[in-house]
């Protein structure tokens, strides 16, 4: 009696040996989204901040799975990377953009996937950031032959749109420096730290980590944590007289911290109070990222640690419009598009331009 399986296996082997063609690999069992996502993240050089962003996306995918189960009755549904196409991407986009409504309609979504923060309406800027991460994952899957086709072919990526960056003028900073905070010593300390940040331009995470030993030959030296795994480049920012005077003022602070920092959340709240107390409360124009409409808001109400970084970049870029030169002081990648938003003509230059027309009348 012929053993059919063995006979078949031997003859299949003979066929591929004779033809010179490689024998197809045996298909492996279905790999879950989470397993693939873990592998994707393990192969990426991501800082802690970027990792957190990708983990937010993972949780969104899990909630999308629950949404499909609830809305379509597909109780066994799971997000199968191999089956994702443009149509599914459109559905995923709709879910993430309108998730705040879907979790109200289907409470089971959050029961199965508890989320600490409230889910709010999301605009195109947010969606653009999320889908850049989705695309990066599928690009990795395609390059590693996990999927046969790239699902983003024909998919229209959302566009980012930002208003002009809002930052303090040098006169504003001077007013803050001269403001009297003698009645609130804690606020005075935070004022000094904010002014220091306006003069060195580092991100809040790097600011909080600065140590006394990071001041070398009259300059602050640090490696930005946001890009340390992708581009471990030391940023060197010479300290001007204002920054140096603040370092000198707090040189006897116990421990190795450069300045007496507090938590970033309290720091941001204090910055708003600092501007208000200094009288920096004029209105500025902001763009609502959800409705894409502009609105006015007092500058102190939108002030934060990132405004200090924008103040550093904006005021230097007005004088030296060389992105590569400025990026050497900020830690941006060379050729970064982040500086495109700072190319607005200064208001004083605009006044000079329109004065040209006065001679025509």
Residue spans of the language-model regions?
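N-terminal core-binding DNA-recognition domain of tyrosine recombinases/integrases
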Residues: 38-49, 58-164, 179-182
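Conserved tyrosine-mediated DNA breakage-rejoining catalytic core shared by Y-recombinases
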Residues: 200, 209-248
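Short, charged phosphate-coordinating catalytic segments
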Residues: 139-149, 197-219
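N-terminal helical hairpins
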Residues: 1-50, 60
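Catalytic-site neighborhood detector that most strongly recognizes the C-terminal catalytic loop/helix
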Residues: 224-228, 264-267, 330-356
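C-terminal secondary-structure termini that scaffold catalytic or DNA-interacting sites
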Residues: 253-255, 280-284, 336, 351-361
């Amino acid at each position: 009696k012929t053993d059919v399986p063995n006979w078949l296996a031997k003859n299949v082997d003979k066929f591929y040996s004779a033809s010179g063609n490689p024998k197809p690999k045996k298909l492996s069992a279905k790999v879950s989204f989470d397993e693939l996502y873990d592998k994707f993240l393990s192969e990426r050089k991501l800082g802690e901040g970027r990792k957190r962003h990708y983990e937010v996306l993972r949780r969104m995918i899990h909630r999308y799975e629950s949404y499909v189960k609830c809305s379509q009755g597909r109780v066994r549904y799971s997000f199968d990377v191999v089956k994702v196409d443009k149509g599914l991407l459109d559905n995923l986009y709709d879910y993430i953009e309108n998730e705040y409504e879907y979790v109200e309609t289907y409470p089971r979504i959050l029961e199965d996937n508890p989320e600490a923060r409230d889910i709010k309406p999301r605009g195109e800027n947010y969606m653009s950031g999320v889908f850049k991460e989705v695309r990066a994952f599928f690009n990795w899957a395609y390059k590693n032959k996990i999927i046969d086709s790239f699902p983003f072919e024909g998919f229209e990526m959302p566009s980012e749109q930002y208003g002009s960056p809002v930052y303090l003028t040098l006169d504003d900073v001077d007013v803050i420096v001269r403001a009297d905070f003698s009645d609130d010593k804690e606020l005075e300390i935070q004022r000094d730290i904010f002014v220091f940040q306006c003069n060195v331009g580092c991100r809040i995470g790097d600011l909080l980590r600065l140590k006394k030993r990071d001041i070398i030959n009259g300059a602050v030296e640090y490696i930005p944590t946001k890009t340390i795994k992708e581009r471990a480049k030391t940023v060197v920012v010479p300290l001007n007289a204002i920054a140096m005077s603040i370092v000198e003022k707090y040189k006897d602070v116990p421990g190795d911290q450069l300045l007496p920092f507090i938590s970033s959340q309290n720091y941001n709240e204090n910055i708003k109070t600092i501007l208000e107390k200094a009288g920096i409360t004029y209105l500025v124009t902001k763009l609502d990222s959800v409705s894409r409409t502009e609105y006015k808001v007092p500058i102190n109400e939108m002030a934060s640690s990132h405004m200090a970084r924008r103040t550093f970049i904006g005021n230097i870029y007005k004088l030296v419009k060389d992105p590569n030169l400025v990026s050497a002081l900020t830690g941006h990648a060379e050729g970064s598009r982040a500086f495109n938003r700072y190319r607005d003509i200064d208001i004083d230059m605009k006044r000079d331009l329109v004065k040209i027309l006065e001679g025509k009348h």
